[in-house]
């Protein structure tokens, strides 16, 4: 669960956009080049487990968080009804019986 403000911080997928005017993968806007493999050319986006961008641990259950920039795992964020990135209350869970299985 991610709030509207943190949804902008999420990463983008490697696949190109479908063609439309103003798309970010067109060559005239300085975007993606033709015949370029983004998976091979983007070394900065590649995950390095020993580097500075390693994944954090959940503040509640201390398990590994598999989303860069998040402080809570998806299970704990769902159970508590909070945003996984900032911890803001997203869902009122007073009358719910939440389980993460």
UniProtKB/Swiss-Prot annotation:
One of its GO terms (molecular function) is PDZ domain binding. InterPro entries: PDZ-binding_CRIPT (IPR019367). Keywords: Cytoplasm, mRNA processing, mRNA splicing, Spliceosome. It is found in: Cytoplasm. GO terms for biological process: cytoplasmic microtubule organization; mRNA processing; RNA splicing. The keyword DNA repair does not apply. Pfam families: Cript. The keyword Cytoplasm applies. Its main location: cytoplasm. One of its GO terms (cellular component) is spliceosomal complex. Component of the minor spliceosome, which splices U12-type introns. As a component of the minor spliceosome, involved in the splicing of U12-type introns in pre-mRNAs. Belongs to the CRIPT family. This is Cysteine-rich PDZ-binding protein. The lineage of its organism: Eukaryota, Metazoa, Chordata, Craniata, Vertebrata. The gene is cript.
